[in-house]
């Protein structure tokens, strides 16, 4: 059985980041709601308590009885988690005189404490809290301080229980990964045996046992998640897997043909469906973004359902759902707040059992598994692309001509990123067709044509993103190529908005 660390989620925006950092230590972990600890699970080696947007003294704050956990497992409380343990054991937590957000330095810490093994003097940590621990219980010992925070970390004397006021999981905490390694490996004793190869071996065995000789259908999008899921399933059940790739007419230029070729080279059994006329007809005159998404979502379900029913004896629907989808689909109280983005509604409509072979993986782990499976690098490193495709990058109504313009402009931009060695430095990139026209001069003639916006961002998880600071020379070359080569465009802009407050996609 796979050993694991349990992360109790109290609602922090960085809880998933804790999970990713633990996984980077080649250790398996699971994120569960703060009140859903898996009692009786003998594979649990330690527990991490996340941060939270709440104050521990609020009536509405999330509270949990740790008596069955404390003493049985090592515990590390982060921010709210640290405050919660101090407060519920008789310590004091109060609003900070000055909220501390951003970089701080550990001015002193107990170098002989196992949590700080290998941590450098004055190391930078990341603070993000409005409350602070002002007094700790008698059996708690302060083990680190910053200039502004006297109790930056503590340990319960005689117990494997620690609390840190800062966020070791955040990139800006310079030795944060080392601290997590000290806890996960040295304290909890995890073996660090979680790897792409071990995941593939165990998952293929599980899929064979789960599916037997049953037939499975999977909807492909051309993206990383569904592609890796397909190759993994193909390794487990071979010809019993049938994949369906629907072209709604709003994919990137030549994408349907190129991706179908990739899938065939991977030995997948793929049915390609050109449903572009259906989608263009149903989208005619629609301008509201959410209506576009719903029309495309329903249309995909209808086409997929129709094609799947042509197959005989299918019992399972496979999806490329990944771990963040599963986490986001439940609130920390266990109620649904967001349905899976993959093929929402299909399992119920088709009366099929659901198979999600990647449901335990983060995005970066999906890519690592893809490499281990021998998939081509250009398929593994593809940028995220919205399910509705270019429909949400065309502001206003959608026509085949607008899609043609956007496909041509987007192709120049993306190929330019590849040619200049910039593609892998960017999390996501694309072109937006704006609902405006502008005056220009080409040759000796006045033009009145469309404007487009280039969008490229850097990110690690899409929760936050910064606009990519691409070279001016590159932007100038792309702008010139688009204006000269794409009929109908005479102006190019560059979107320099970050998320937040803007989103990555315009619609």
Curated annotation (Swiss-Prot):
<dbReference type="InterPro" id="IPR022955">
    <property type="entry name" value="GMP_synthase"/>
</dbReference>
<keyword id="KW-0658">Purine biosynthesis</keyword>
<dbReference type="InterPro" id="IPR004739">
    <property type="entry name" value="GMP_synth_GATase"/>
</dbReference>
<keyword id="KW-0332">GMP biosynthesis</keyword>
<comment type="pathway">
    <text>Purine metabolism; GMP biosynthesis; GMP from XMP (L-Gln route): step 1/1.</text>
</comment>
<dbReference type="InterPro" id="IPR025777">
    <property type="entry name" value="GMPS_ATP_PPase_dom"/>
</dbReference>
<comment type="subunit">
    <text>Homodimer.</text>
</comment>
<dbReference type="GO" id="GO:0003921">
    <property type="term" value="F:GMP synthase activity"/>
</dbReference>
<protein>
    <recommendedName>
        <fullName>GMP synthase [glutamine-hydrolyzing]</fullName>
        <ecNumber>6.3.5.2</ecNumber>
    </recommendedName>
</protein>
<dbReference type="Pfam" id="PF02540">
    <property type="entry name" value="NAD_synthase"/>
</dbReference>
<keyword id="KW-0436">Ligase</keyword>
<feature type="domain" description="GMPS ATP-PPase">
    <location>
        <begin position="194"/>
        <end position="382"/>
    </location>
</feature>
<dbReference type="InterPro" id="IPR014729">
    <property type="entry name" value="Rossmann-like_a/b/a_fold"/>
</dbReference>
<dbReference type="Pfam" id="PF00117">
    <property type="entry name" value="GATase"/>
</dbReference>
<dbReference type="Pfam" id="PF00958">
    <property type="entry name" value="GMP_synt_C"/>
</dbReference>
<dbReference type="InterPro" id="IPR001674">
    <property type="entry name" value="GMP_synth_C"/>
</dbReference>
<feature type="active site">
    <location>
        <position position="169"/>
    </location>
</feature>
<comment type="function">
    <text>Catalyzes the synthesis of GMP from XMP.</text>
</comment>
<dbReference type="GO" id="GO:0005829">
    <property type="term" value="C:cytosol"/>
</dbReference>
<dbReference type="InterPro" id="IPR029062">
    <property type="entry name" value="Class_I_gatase-like"/>
</dbReference>
<feature type="binding site">
    <location>
        <begin position="221"/>
        <end position="227"/>
    </location>
    <ligand>
        <name>ATP</name>
    </ligand>
</feature>
<keyword id="KW-0547">Nucleotide-binding</keyword>
<dbReference type="InterPro" id="IPR022310">
    <property type="entry name" value="NAD/GMP_synthase"/>
</dbReference>
<dbReference type="GO" id="GO:0005524">
    <property type="term" value="F:ATP binding"/>
</dbReference>
<dbReference type="InterPro" id="IPR017926">
    <property type="entry name" value="GATASE"/>
</dbReference>
<keyword id="KW-0067">ATP-binding</keyword>
<keyword id="KW-0315">Glutamine amidotransferase</keyword>
<feature type="active site">
    <location>
        <position position="167"/>
    </location>
</feature>
<feature type="active site" description="Nucleophile">
    <location>
        <position position="79"/>
    </location>
</feature>
<feature type="domain" description="Glutamine amidotransferase type-1">
    <location>
        <begin position="4"/>
        <end position="193"/>
    </location>
</feature>
């Amino acid at each position: 059985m796979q050993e694991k660390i349990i992360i109790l989620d109290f609602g922090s925006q960085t809880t998933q980041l804790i999970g990713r950092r633990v996984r980077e230590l080649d250790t398996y972990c699971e994120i569960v709601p703060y009140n859903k600890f898996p009692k009786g699970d003998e594979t649990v080696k330690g527990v991490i308590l996340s941060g939270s947007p709440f104050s521990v003294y609020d009536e509405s704050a999330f509270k949990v009885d740790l008596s069955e956990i404390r003493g049985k497992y090592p515990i590390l409380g982060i921010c709210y988690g640290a405050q919660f343990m101090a407060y519920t054991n008789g310590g004091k937590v109060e609003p900070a005189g000055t909220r501390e957000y951003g970089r701080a330095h550990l001015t002193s810490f107990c170098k002989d404490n196992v949590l700080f093994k290998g941590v450098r003097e004055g190391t930078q940590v990341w603070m993000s809290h409005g409350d602070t621990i002002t007094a700790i219980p008698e059996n708690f010992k302060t083990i680190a301080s910053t200039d502004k925070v006297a109790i930056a970390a503590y340990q319960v004397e005689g117990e494997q229980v620690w609390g840190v006021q800062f966020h070791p999981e955040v990139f800006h905490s310079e030795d944060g990964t080392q601290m997590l390694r000290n806890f996960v490996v040295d304290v909890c004793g995890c073996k660090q045996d979680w790897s792409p190869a071990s995941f593939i071996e165990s998952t293929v065995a599980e899929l064979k046992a789960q599916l037997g000789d049953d037939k499975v259908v999977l909807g492909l999008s051309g993206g990383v998640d569904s592609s890796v899921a397909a190759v993994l399933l193909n390794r487990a059940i071979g010809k019993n897997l049938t994949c369906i790739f629907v072209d709604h007419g709003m994919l990137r230029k030549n994408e349907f043909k190129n991706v179908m070729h990739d899938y065939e080279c991977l030995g997948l059994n793929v049915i390609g469906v050109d449903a572009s006329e259906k989608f263009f007809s149903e989208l005619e005159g629609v301008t509201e973004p959410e209506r576009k998404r719903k029309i495309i979502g329903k249309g995909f379900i209808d086409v997929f359902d129709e094609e799947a029913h042509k197959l005989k004896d299918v019992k399972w629907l496979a999806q490329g759902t990944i771990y963040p989808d599963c986490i986001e689909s439940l609130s920390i109280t266990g109620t649904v707040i967001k349905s899976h983005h993959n093929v929402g509604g299909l399992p119920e409509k088709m009366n099929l059992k659901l198979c999600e072979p990647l449901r335990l993986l983060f995005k970066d782990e999906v890519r690592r598994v893809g490499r281990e499976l021998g998939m081509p690098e250009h398929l593994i490193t593809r940028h995220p692309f919205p399910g509705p495709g270019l429909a949400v990058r065309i502001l206003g109504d959608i026509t085949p001509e607008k899609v043609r313009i956007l496909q041509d402009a987007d192709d120049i931009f993306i190929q330019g990123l590849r040619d200049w060695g910039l593609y892998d430095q960017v999390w996501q990139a694309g072109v937006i067709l704006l609902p405006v026209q502008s005056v220009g001069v080409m040759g000796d003639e006045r033009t009145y044509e469309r404007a487009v916006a280039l969008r490229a961002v850097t990110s690690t998880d899409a929760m936050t993103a910064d606009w990519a600071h691409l070279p001016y020379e590159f932007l100038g070359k792309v702008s010139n190529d688009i204006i000269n080569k794409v009929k109908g465009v005479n102006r190019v802009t560059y979107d320099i908005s970050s998320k937040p407050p803007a989103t990555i996609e315009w619609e």
